[in-house]
Amino acid sequence: MRLSTSTNLYNFDRSVPYQLSMEDAMRVCRDAGYSFLDANFCGMSRLGKKEAPMTLDDWDERVRSWKVLADRTGINFRQAHAFFSVKGSITADALPDGEFGEEMMRRSVLAAEVLGVEWMVVHPVNILTDGHNDPEASFRYNLEYYGKWAEFFHAHHVGMAIENMLCGGRHNNVWADIDRLCALVDAIGRD
């Protein structure tokens, strides 16, 4: 059995998130006995945080340095988490976090390719209609949105794993419904 943890496990303190570098997270996780890690690009893509290397001009150099460190220390990145918006539901005419979000998603895929990631998690978004999450509109939006990204993932040899979301907060998350999530995965049709 292979046990894995995420690089943000070590890096996440809700009162002061993303204060520690990816390099430190890798070293501490390796010292704790983990050789398989989930590269959390989402956590490394948050503007205004102390550690947000995916937002920097030299992001690709940082990623290559993570690969060198991983190879030197015996770490394997079999999975990752792509950038995703934490701002909540959007309208059907919007992009999750706009052009910034699109660039962070692109960088996540390219970084995953460099690190040898086999599967990268993405999170579907909820679409608001008349101030409420709309399951049908959300399905259509995510089918088009992640269908587009599936081509880019595939071109860079990274599998896309669409992960469910918890239900809670101001609006119920339509992606907490496992049947809806499975239907989306089947409709996109990529592995």
Language model features with spans:
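N-terminal pre-domain/capping segments
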Residues: 1-118, 136-137, 147, 153-154, ...
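Distinct, well-ordered alpha-helical segments
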Residues: 18, 133, 139, 166, ...
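Charge-rich, low-complexity amphipathic helices
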Residues: 50-52, 91-93, 127, 133-135, ...
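Active-site groove signature of glycoside hydrolases
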Residues: 112-134, 156-168
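Hydrophobic, well-ordered secondary-structure segments
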Residues: 139-146, 150, 159-160, 164-166, ...
